Amino acid sequence: ADGMSFAVFDGMGGAAYGEVASEIAVQKLRKYEKKLKYADGTRMLDQLVSSFTTEANDAICDMLAEKHCTTGGTTFSMLYFLRDSIKLYYLGDSRIYRYKSDGLTRLTRDHTVANQKVDAAIYTEEEAKKSPDQHRLTLFIGSDHKKLGLNADSRPLVPLEMGSKFLLCT
């Protein structure tokens, strides 16, 4: 499985531009497919994913500007198999879970206003779950309108364990 990757995108925005945004992101990721397959470590992988998210973000922002649309984009989650581990990348609220014999564990944290307020001690975890802010995304592909460079969030390598299953969902 070394070098294999799996990704999910969930377009958002009115007038069907979310669907267009997610398709743009898929096409940009396909451009990186061969390079990703042969990445020789996490540093190279991080650089490739950063280049992909920046390129996809800029293309989506250009498309939205052409359509005179101020909002839109796509969430993104990706699993990459690297030797006996996996590397996770994500933007938005498309989650990645691991299922093994002791249950289901969420491996990502949503990029939402509610979670920012939890971090700032404005909300408790319970208040955040009930807040409309839990659906207001702070990061996604298409959120960097100034085109400063968009980096996906990631986690340290997650060891692969016999019988583990991974779920990418939106």
Please provide the spans of the model-predicted regions:
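PP2C/PPM-type serine/threonine phosphatase catalytic domain
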Residues: A1-T170
